[in-house]
A protein has these predicted regions:
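Extracellular/virion structural assembly segments
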Residues: 1-140
Length: 140
C-alpha cells in the first residue's frame, strides 16, 4: 500500500491508487542477461576461442503488472488517466523500498499492454512492457 512503490519520485498508491500486481517483484528483481562474449570459430582449430574479459550486461525488456483502485467511478477514472499520462512521459523511474534504495530507470514501451476492469468500474489490472536500457545504472 502506501510506501510500497514509488514511480518518478511519487508514492504510487497515494498519487494514483496503484499497487504492485502479481509477479511484479519477480519481474523487476530478476537476474540480468549478459551480452554475448566475443567469439572466434576458426576452421583452422578445434572448438572456438572466447574472450571472457570485461563481461557486460545486456539491456532488458520486462513486463510489470499493476493494480489501480479508485474510491468511486469518477475517482477511478481520474486516477487511471493520471497514471496513463505519467507512463506516457516515457521515462519511468521505479523504486521499491523492500528491494533497497536502487532506482530502476525504465522506459515505457506502450506495447503488449493488457488491461482489465471490474464490473463496478473502480478497479483494474494493467500489464505493460518496459525497457531497462542499462540495468547496471540503478543509482539515485
Amino acid at each position: 500500500m502506501t510506501g510500497d512503490l514509488f514511480i518518478n519520485g511519487k508514492d504510487a498508491y497515494t498519487t494514483w491508487g496503484v499497487n504492485m500486481g502479481d509477479g511484479f517483484l519477480d519481474a523487476i528483481d530478476g537476474f540480468l542477461s549478459m551480452k554475448s562474449f566475443i567469439e572466434n570459430d576458426s576452421r583452422m582449430e578445434h572448438g572456438k576461442r572466447m574472450i571472457l574479459s570485461n563481461p557486460k550486461v545486456a539491456s532488458r525488456e520486462i513486463t510489470l503488472r499493476f493494480t489501480l483502485k479508485g474510491d468511486s467511478q469518477e475517482d477511478y477514472r481520474a486516477k487511471r488517466n493520471a497514471f496513463e499520462e505519467e507512463l506516457y512521459k516515457g521515462s519511468v523511474n521505479v523504486r521499491v523500498p523492500v528491494l533497497g534504495e536502487q532506482v530502476y530507470k525504465l522506459v515505457y514501451l506502450g506495447k503488449s499492454v493488457s488491461y482489465g476492469m471490474n464490473t463496478a468500474r473502480t478497479l483494474c489490472t494493467i500489464s505493460a512492457k518496459f525497457d531497462e536500457p542499462n540495468p547496471m545504472d540503478r543509482t539515485v
